[in-house]
Amino acid sequence: LPQGAPSFDQAAFIQSAAEKTGLPTVDLLGALTEHAGEPIYYRTDHHWTTCGAFYGANALLTALGKEPLKETDFTPEIASTDFNGTLYSTSGIHWLAPDTIEYWVSEDDLRVTSWKSGKEEPGRLYDRSYLEHKDKYSSFLGGNQPLCVLENLSLIHI
């Protein structure tokens, strides 16, 4: 934001909302702030990058008492090097170089169920057809939808 632009304390707002609900929370703000120098958000979009989602997932796992993931568990695949997100489209910051979209998770042994049309149907973790269009971010899960369930079929339940 420009110097002197009105703003509000997002951390205080999040803390206040958490206290009012009394529900358990996950400190995503702290997890992302720890990695502020890394590409956790797209420069041209409001979404987390896959790297940001990795740190968010680890914050959730830690809050649940589970072992965090390691970056070495993944082999990132570059899906697109020409992603221009909604900030690019709406702000006039067209001098920024496009972002890169990475896929970190293999679709092997993963079942995705979508309710995109309002009824249960098979889904996909990555819908690569979106990579040929402007809305490349929708390549994740086929875009926004009311509900999507991912099941790891190779996970052993004890």
Question: Where are the regions that the model predicts?
Answer:
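Acidic helix-start/capping segments at beta-turn-to-alpha-helix junctions
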Residues: 1, 33, 76-80
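Secreted/periplasmic serine-hydrolase-like ester/acetyl group-modifying domain
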Residues: 63-154
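Membrane-embedded segments
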Residues: 1-21, 41-43, 48-52
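Short, conserved phosphate-binding/catalytic loop or strand-edge motifs used
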Residues: 31-38
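Histidine-centered active-site loop/cap adjacent to the catalytic His
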Residues: 42-71
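Conserved small/polar residues in nucleotide/adenosyl-binding loops
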Residues: 156-158
